[in-house]
């Protein structure tokens, strides 16, 4: 189960993009995690994270003009300086890392904040059209 989609659904936010995340597997007695994008020999200095976000972001950089990244944790550090636009959860490990390394980002407190920011960007883009 992708645990991000229910968060968006709870806030009535439609998803128009692919989500790359680990999966939570539930059975009667246990919860386990499936790592779908694990890279054993990751070249980043942060160690194995189970979901090589750097590789995914690099793949997108090769396909598109701009990479927009949303993160909050330690495993998001490797993408922080690769993303063209970076949204960082306020008071998170990633925000601390970005401050310490002078990486430009936009802070958000909740997914609802992001939704409002994206809606504003969409309105601005349409007004130029």
Where do the model's predicted regions map?
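C-terminal cap/substrate-recognition subdomain and adjoining C-terminal extension
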Residues: 1-129
């Amino acid at each position: 189960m992708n645990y991000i989609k229910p968060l968006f659904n709870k806030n009535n936010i439609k998803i128009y993009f692919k989500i790359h995340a680990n999966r939570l597997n539930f059975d009667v007695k246990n919860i386990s995690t499936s790592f779908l994008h694990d890279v054993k020999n990751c070249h980043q200095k942060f160690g194995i994270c189970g979901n090589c976000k750097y590789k995914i972001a690099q793949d997108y950089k090769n396909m598109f003009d701009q990479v927009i990244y949303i993160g909050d944790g330690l495993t998001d550090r490797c993408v922080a300086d690769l993303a063209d636009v970076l949204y960082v959860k306020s008071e998170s490990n990633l925000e601390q890392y970005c401050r310490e390394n002078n990486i430009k980002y936009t802070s958000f407190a909740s997914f609802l904040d992001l939704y409002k920011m994206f809606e504003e960007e969409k309105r601005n883009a349409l007004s130029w059209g």
